Amino acid sequence: MLLIIQNGYITPYIYRYLDEDYEIIKSFNVDVTTMDLDKYSVVIILGGYQSVVDINKYSYLLKVIELIKKCLTVKKPLFGICLGFQLIAYALGCEIKSSGKLNVGYDTTILGYDNVFRCHIDYIIPNDSVEVLEYFDNMPYLYKHDNHVYGIQCHPDIAPECIKKYSNHIESYDYAAANKDSINKTNAIIIKYILNLLRDSIKKD
């Protein structure tokens, strides 16, 4: 079973792309440090509106970081998306900075695809704990730590039919409406690809 940590208030849509049972826990309602990690194959840390630059404003995100560190200690496979990508990097000692602008759109190029939604302001400054696998717009967009942690800055978890709940970017609305089938296909492929890498890491251990 997958453990999904929901950090934002919008209902997650990642379930559309999963091939395994899952449990969604809202970090702002539950002390996530109490979760029994032995029940789960992979822990997924989702995005949210918050900024890691101002992490001390969000006491529940400090609990998420504690959970991440616990996962790192026991080598529980971790998958971070957007804010989750930044939270894991922060837990690994990376610096998080603001780009000073909203980076938004569907023209993100990653893993050979060019139709993945992105919507973020902050970005990570990598250290030796993470291996950056891909950059986009001169910012890290995909990294790994050992073989049991992967993070992605963009949003293969957001279904195109739901994009208006996440952004008021008109060009993204129009692109999502015209290309929803191909976007959903890409999202599913990327999510499955990363989850399979993490599952393989369990077998190797």
Curated annotation (Swiss-Prot):
Note whether S-adenosyl-L-methionine occurs among the keywords: no
Which GO molecular function entries does the Swiss-Prot or TrEMBL record give? transferase activity
What PROSITE patterns has UniProt attached to this entry? Answer: GATASE_TYPE_1
SUPFAM superfamilies recorded:
Class I glutamine amidotransferase-like (SSF52317)
Q: Where is the active site?
A: 82, 155, 157
Q: Residue ranges of the Glutamine amidotransferase type-1 domain?
A: 1-176
Specify the superkingdom.
Answer: Viruses
Keyword presence, rRNA-binding: no
User: Gene3D superfamilies of this UniProt entry?
Assistant: 3.40.50.880
Keywords for this protein: Glutamine amidotransferase, Transferase
User: What is the official name of this protein in its record?
Assistant: Putative glutamine amidotransferase-like protein L716
Taxonomic classification, please?
Viruses, Varidnaviria, Bamfordvirae, Nucleocytoviricota, Megaviricetes
